[in-house]
């Protein structure tokens, strides 16, 4: 994915680490 900053804090951490 590669959201970066998402609405969900927990999801944000995962998206931030798995930026793709």
Curated annotation (Swiss-Prot):
Transmembrane segments: none
A GO CC term attached to the entry: extracellular region
EC number: 3.4.23.-
BP GO annotations: proteolysis
Tissue expression: Expressed in chorionic epithelium (trophectoderm).
Recorded GO MF terms: aspartic-type endopeptidase activity
Entry's localization field: Secreted
Swiss-Prot/TrEMBL keywords: Aspartyl protease, Glycoprotein, Hydrolase, Protease, Secreted
Post-translational modification: N-glycosylated.
Protein family per UniProt: Belongs to the peptidase A1 family.
Descriptive protein name: Pregnancy-associated glycoprotein 75
């Amino acid at each position: 994915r590669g959201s970066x900053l998402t609405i969900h804090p927990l999801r944000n951490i995962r998206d931030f680490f798995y930026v793709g």
